[in-house]
């Protein structure tokens, strides 16, 4: 709080990596510059995965932008208002600090950012931006492996040898 002062700030969760032509944070900063309020980075997830994320109830505004009406932390499939998930990227106004100071523990006995954002939404408009790019959940073992392979294959100095390694391993897999 003392470092940020009275400025909006970005929160990037370390278990989410986004590969995009225009960096995800740049996309969100552009949205912030237009709307001048908190922006949540979102993408659609499969309905069966809504219980892994903060899920939004939204009103579509334009193109990739939604106005947030409500949010639910890790709802059941039946209770999810949509399949639009908050995916580890936020630009938040400093008002959130006043809310966090008095925020009660939520799911898992922890202070949940989603709960604090719900309170913030009663004080100011919050928008969601459906960012472009491939998101990897590197907190998940398979997501970590997918990111490692995809990023290695993009590196010119690794690509040929790594591709040969993958082909060798794939040939060993019995079907």
Residue ranges and their predicted role:
Residues 1-58, 92-94, 100-103:
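Conserved beta-loop-beta/alpha segment of the NTase-like Rossmann-fold superfamily
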Residues 9-10, 29-33, 62-164:
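Catalytic-core segments of class I nucleotidyltransferases/pyrophosphorylases
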């Amino acid at each position: 709080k003392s470092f940020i002062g009275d400025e909006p700030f970005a929160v990037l969760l370390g278990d989410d990596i986004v590969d995009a032509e225009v960096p995800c944070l740049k996309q969100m900063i552009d949205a912030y510059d237009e709307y001048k309020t908190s922006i949540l980075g979102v993408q659609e997830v499969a309905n069966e995965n809504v219980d892994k994320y903060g899920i939004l109830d939204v009103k579509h505004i334009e193109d990739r932008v939604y106005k947030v009406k409500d949010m639910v932390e890790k709802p059941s499939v039946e209770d999810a208002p949509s399949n639009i998930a908050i995916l580890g990227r936020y630009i938040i106004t400093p008002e959130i600090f006043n809310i966090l100071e008095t925020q009660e523990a939520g799911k898992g006995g922890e202070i949940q950012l989603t709960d604090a954002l719900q309170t913030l939404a009663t004080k100011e408009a919050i928008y969601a931006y459906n960012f472009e790019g491939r998101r990897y959940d590197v907190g998940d073992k398979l997501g970590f492996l997918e990111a490692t392979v995809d990023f290695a294959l993009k590196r010119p100095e690794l690509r040929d040898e790594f591709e040969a390694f993958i082909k060798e391993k794939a040939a060993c897999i019995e079907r």
